[in-house]
Design a protein with these regions (language model features):
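Bacterial Sec-pathway N-terminal export signals of envelope proteins
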Residues: 1-17, 22, 41, 49, ...
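Residue-level signature of outer-membrane beta-barrel architecture
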Residues: 39-41, 62, 87, 140, ...
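Amphipathic alpha-helical coiled-coil segments
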Residues: 1-11, 68, 72-91, 109, ...
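Small/polar, glycine/serine/threonine/aspartate-rich low-complexity segments that form flexible
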Residues: 16-53, 213-253
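Periplasmic alpha-helical coiled-coil/stalk elements that build and connect Gram-negative outer-membrane
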Residues: 71-183, 286-289, 293, 336
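Outer-membrane beta-barrel channels and translocator barrels
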Residues: 14-16, 42-44, 73, 203, ...
């Protein structure tokens, strides 16, 4: 944007001023001896058209900056909520770790007391170790996401989620989508306006050019090889001016520039229509994705979340009392982990769907 604003200053660029010195020792103090200052310039409408084109291009760059800003915000939100999701998974695994550690100790005690086989103890120990390996993987993923977030925010300070628990993003005003009012649509429209101005600027090449020349006397009195009177005019040094008009008789190059600019405009319009179709399709897909994620989230929040906590608690008590076998207890633990993880997955999928729609609609 700053570069485009600076380039606006080139709209009124004039050609270089020509200075010619023409001494003629065969004449006296006449117009042959003097300086000539010549300035060529385009027709005034050329500068106006060029200025309008550069202003339109600056506006298009501002719109493009808004598109990039929306993309960056969406990437930051995506990374942030992915990190929050992984942190929530780590909390689940840490809670399960305490359960599995207790299960391993009980299995070891029962094995040493001769109340169970070694297979039960080995199975409990394996479950505990597998859970800790999963915890290590999740911690590594959190660190990776944290580095990504630091890069996106251009900071050296570690970023930690402000929320303690993973929760669904409040989805508001996500039911409709107007491409023309979105950041992408506004950018494409501004590009078309800039290309329209470019066509007008190219057509201004058919306008004539102007030139202005001023002459002033400059006699070198000491240089007189022919011994003639070379005295200066006593009344003054100004010898007159000359105004010229350049008529574009050969305008094939200008016609080619106009046609090229018109082709660029046609391609940009096709690109805008294609992008509009793609964005509207993406919105429909994201809406369906959000609805499916919402239904899945409601299911886990209304049913299985409470059931899994109850199953985990009852199975632990019954296993310690010897009322269920270790196989049944392992199944109960695995079911608890699966339900908690599926609930976390449902929240994450819902949040990602919301972020995708917010990116399209510009509500970030």
């Amino acid at each position: 944007v700053e570069r485009a604003q600076v380039i606006q200053g080139t709209a009124w660029e004039l050609d270089k001023t020509e200075v010619a010195f023409s001494p003629n020792p065969a004449t006296g103090g006449e117009s042959d001896n003097g300086f000539t200052f010549t300035q060529s310039l385009d027709f005034p409408t050329v500068y106006a058209s060029r200025r309008n084109q550069l202003k339109a291009e600056t506006q298009a760059e501002k719109s493009r900056l808004n598109v990039v800003s929306q993309q960056l915000k969406a990437e930051i939100a995506n990374t942030y909520y992915q990190m929050l999701y992984q942190a929530h998974r780590l909390q689940i695994l840490q809670r399960i770790d305490s359960v599995l550690e207790r299960y391993s100790k009980i299995a070891e005690m029962r094995y040493k007391a001769g109340e169970s086989r070694q297979l039960e103890y080995l199975s409990a120990d394996r479950k505990c170790n597998e859970n800790r390996l999963e915890m290590a993987d999740v911690k590594s993923e959190i660190e990776r996401l944290q580095i990504d977030l630091m890069t996106q925010l251009n900071t050296q300070e570690p970023i930690k989620p402000a929320e303690e628990n993973l929760s669904a993003i409040a989805a508001q005003n996500l039911n409709s989508y107007n491409y023309q009012q979105s950041a992408d649509g506004i950018y494409q429209q501004d590009k078309l306006i800039a290309l329209d101005k470019e066509i007008k600027a190219a057509k201004s090449g058919f306008a004539p050019s102007l030139s202005l020349s001023l002459r002033t006397q400059c006699v070198i009195s000491s240089w007189n090889p022919y011994n003639i009177d070379r005295s200066r005019f006593a009344e003054g040094n100004f010898f007159g001016f000359e105004i010229g008009v350049g008529i574009p008789l050969f305008y094939g190059s200008t016609k080619a520039k106009v046609k090229a600019a018109q082709k660029d405009r046609e391609l940009a319009e096709i690109e805008m229509r294609q992008e509009q179709t793609e964005k509207e399709r993406d919105f429909r897909l994201c809406t369906k994705r959000l609805q499916a994620a919402s239904n899945r989230l409601k299911y886990y929040e209304q049913n299985n979340q409470a059931h899994s906590a109850q199953i985990s608690k009852l199975s632990a008590i019954e296993y310690e009392n010897g009322e269920i076998s270790y196989v049944e207890y392992v199944n109960a633990i695995e079911e608890t982990i699966a339900v908690l993880m599926k609930h976390a997955d449902a929240i994450n999928e819902y949040n990602q769907a919301v972020i995708a729609i917010q990116r399209l609609t510009g509500i970030m």
